[in-house]
Amino acid sequence: PRSPYGKRSKALDPAGAAAFGARLKAEGYGPLVVHAPYVYNLAGKDEAKRAFAIEALAEDVELLTAIRETGQEVYINIHPGAHVGQGSETGCRLISEGLNQVFERADGVMVLLETMAGKGTECGRNFEELATIMNGVENKANVGVTFDTCHVLDAGYDLVNDYDGVMHQLDVVIGLAKVKAIHVNDSQFGLDSHKDRHANIGEGQLGIPFFTRLVNDPIMAKLPMILETKEQTPATHRDEIELLRGLVQK
């Protein structure tokens, strides 16, 4: 609906939204996962900025609902927020309260909380914090999770050496059914670094064996996978998609 760095969105064109959704569905696209602007901070202490984030996110949900009504599956992904010194407990509570306000106005599209690397005062730095936020949301059906592979490793979960253990923990704390999308990124700095620096596929600390495991996981492989790696050349993402597809065991 708007630039990831911008604050304003264009007015909704119902006919255009319907045509877009119908075309996606007709051409066999999977779920549409929109990334909300990075400037949203539902956990912030600045009341004006927090009010803006709530209002803008509600507007985004309203806009995307017009596409969902065509039958196209749609989600909006957000970075949960940063508590900026208020403490994670307060930050998680504010995020839940903000989402409840969003859903009072618009509830036609599920909001996905992205797993975070734990940089600075980020909330959502572990599965427990995400679960706390989700448990504070009144309409549980309106909230899910985006699993960012780089962020999860950077947050301290050993996806390389204990893939099954991490997935079990994710299932116990949040529930695998709540995971609706995957951001597929390698990691420059790796386990427990809290750096959030993406690397191209196979060129970081996760490595090809991990991605082989991921794309052959019977549950995770069914989810939409979105690359957020650096485009080194115009062919980078095409080549990475081909690489990932080549890892799928027939």
Regions found by a protein language model. Name each.
Residues 1-36, 40, 44-59, 250:
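N-terminal pre-domain/capping segments
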Residues 1-3, 37-39, 81-83, 114-118, ...:
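Active-site beta-loop-alpha junctions enriched in small/polar residues
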Residues 8-16, 45-56, 86-97, 121-129, ...:
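Alpha-helix N-cap and loop-to-helix initiation/capping positions
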Residues 14-34, 95-108, 131-137, 205-217:
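Alpha-helix-loop-beta-strand connector modules within alpha/beta enzyme cores
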Residues 25, 41-144:
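Active-site acidic/histidine proton-transfer and metal-coordination neighborhood
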Residues 32, 75-76, 111, 182, ...:
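Hydrophobic residues within beta-strands of alpha/beta enzymes
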Residues 131-250:
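Histidine-acidic metal/acid-base catalytic patches
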